[in-house]
Amino acid sequence: MTLLEATPTKSTSESGPVSFSKSRPLDALAIAGAILCCALWGGNAVAVKAVVGDVPPIGLAGIRFCISIPVIGWIASRTPNKFKIQRKHWWLVPIHGLFLAAQVSTFNWGTSHGQAGRSSVFINVHPLVVTPLSVWILHEHVGWKALTGLASAFSGVIVLVAGRLMAGGDPKADVIVFCSGCLFGIQSVFQKWCYRKVAPASLLFWQTPIAILICFLGTTVFESEAEWKVSQSAVLAIMYQGLAVSGVCFSVWSLLLGRYEAASLAALGFMTPLFGISLGTWIHAEPVTSSLILGAALIGFGVYLTAIDKRKRKVPA
């Protein structure tokens, strides 16, 4: 069964909402999808840093959303519910569009004024936000294995980037990226809550044009004096962010979030900095350090504990 086929199609609304009671514990499909997203997300901070000298942060967010529309639309068209949203649920779309614009714009701004390595740490606080909110709002059960796995994976991230954190940076930029990570966590739980009413792919497709309008309005108001340049590196970086990150990652992650428990899925997000640092080590032919090995081991152990936490629970039909 593919992720597209796995998306629920019948419930209390014709747009295919997801019942919390039908959220599943992690399985091989969830882990494979999360690995894909984290691998592509791993290069996002570097891609943002590569282009911010040519394109202002808020404008960059708007452009990448424009590029992502065909990918998101194609994936949504392949789901059973396609683009349907009931009229009474359309009020959710602009709220999610605002969330999307604010989260990506703040990440871009913080990364442009800080360091990509530090951004990869502070943006990945979102699992620590999702876990308590998913218990409180979504009534998910988080077992001791999942909590231990969450702590292990987060410790692995700290080990991976300890040197970058100690090297210093712009505190204001760090705070902005930290807030972006918190926004992503809140947004994830709110999305999961809304999936009772609206299918994941439909919501993502319709919220994206709203985010585009907000970003272009924001760049007009706040970045009117910023320079816009066109370079080969900037074009490649923007295409990567639009197609791979906003297109593929956002679509796959939304479908995963609609099917699986938010807290367990969010913990897998700690793999993102591991992929980013490993990719940088490979590209630049850097030596494999003890911190990379230890960090990878802690993250891997954390992901394993999270994946097996609900294994004995009956999977809903």
What are these language model-derived features?
Residues 5-6, 72, 94, 133, ...:
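Hydrophobic transmembrane alpha-helices of multi-pass small-molecule transport proteins
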Residues 20-21, 50, 54, 68-86, ...:
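Membrane-interface helix-cap regions at the ends of transmembrane helices
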Residues 39-69, 115-118, 186-211, 224, ...:
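Juxtamembrane helix-loop-helix junctions in multi-pass membrane proteins
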Residues 61-63, 119-125, 190-213, 243-282:
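Helix-helix packing/entry segments at the starts of transmembrane helices
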Residues 25-31, 54-62, 85-90, 162-183, ...:
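Juxtamembrane helix-entry segments on the extracytoplasmic side of multipass membrane proteins
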Residues 2-62, 98, 102, 106, ...:
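Glycine-/small-residue-enriched transmembrane alpha-helix faces in small-molecule transporters
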Residues 40, 44-45, 73-123, 131, ...:
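Specific transmembrane alpha-helical segments of multi-pass solute transporters/efflux pumps
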Residues 59-70, 100, 108-141, 146, ...:
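Specific alpha-helical transmembrane segments that line the substrate/conduction pathway
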